[in-house]
């Protein structure tokens, strides 16, 4: 009889351990729920998506309103095209809204931040519908580029003179003579 009780307790413990392992796996896979809410699809094209991945969150002010459904390469422009699945209850997003790739923390995962624009029928703005494209996008900031800008003082402009010697100070028209010569 005592052996039967021990077997039941071991079975309960194993079942609890399996449920805990399943919970951890779902959290690690970033699965928020088993049920699916109705969504609509939006598209956006970026110059550089960095480490953005499918299933990355789309948020407005820190609140997750959707997910990245797919990332493909546009066959005409060869730019990354991101497909977004936005929850249907957030269906009043103006077409003046912008989308930027951000990183949670210094080296955390990347997500899409949706900055809601303004709606003004007199200016011809509209609400984004299923299948529309967000025009105003800001690409991911690449850590190596930021470090390079900091180290070399670049402001993001093209570095066509980066290997040139520094120019003479204005008003200094003095020329240098080789050593051993006199003026």
From Swiss-Prot:
Gene Ontology molecular-function annotations: phospholipid binding; phospholipid transfer activity
Protein name (Swiss-Prot/TrEMBL): Intermembrane phospholipid transport system binding protein MlaD
Record-annotated membrane-spanning stretches: 8-28
InterPro entries to which the protein is assigned, alphabetical: ABC_MlaD, Mce/MlaD, MlaD_Phospholipid_Transporter
Top-rank lineage group of the source organism: Bacteria
One Gene Ontology CC term in the entry: phospholipid-translocating ATPase complex
Disulfide-linked positions: none
Region (Disordered): 155-183
Annotated knockout phenotype: Mutation leads to accumulation of phospholipid in the outer leaflet of the outer membrane and increased outer membrane permeability. It confers sensitivity to SDS-EDTA.
Gene that encodes it: mlaD
